[in-house]
Amino acid sequence: MIANALNGKPLPVYGQGLNVRDWLYVEDHCKAVDLIVRDGRIGEVYNIGGRNEMRNIDIVKLIIEDLGQGEITFVTDRKGHDLRYAIDPAKIKDELGWKPSTCFHDGIKKTIRWYLDNRSWWEEIISGEYQGYYQRMYGDR
């Protein structure tokens, strides 16, 4: 979404954007995975979540507001698309003491800043092969 907004491309949102997801800053996710690898019990499953559920449309609107650019395009929702993914991270908190250290709003701002500061890195990724994937996924919607 951020790359699309920065490149003047539409921001595709499934359905009306009412799907709810649990949002978590990437560094918090990486720290949780590292903690599980080091201190988790072998064979156990640990859900990693931020307890920060938000609708997709609200996330996209935050990105547009922060960047001052971007246009939403509503696309046909996927068949069987879950309306809500609820993550219960109680086990990782209780057993390993993990919880996110970055609040959502700080995390989204850091993420947007990363995209602004690292254009040369991500622009290579969204060219060529990735463009074919993107067209297959969203071209007809």
Task: Label every PLM stretch briefly.
Residues 2-141:
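C-terminal substrate-binding subdomain of Rossmann-fold SDR/epimerase-dehydratase oxidoreductases
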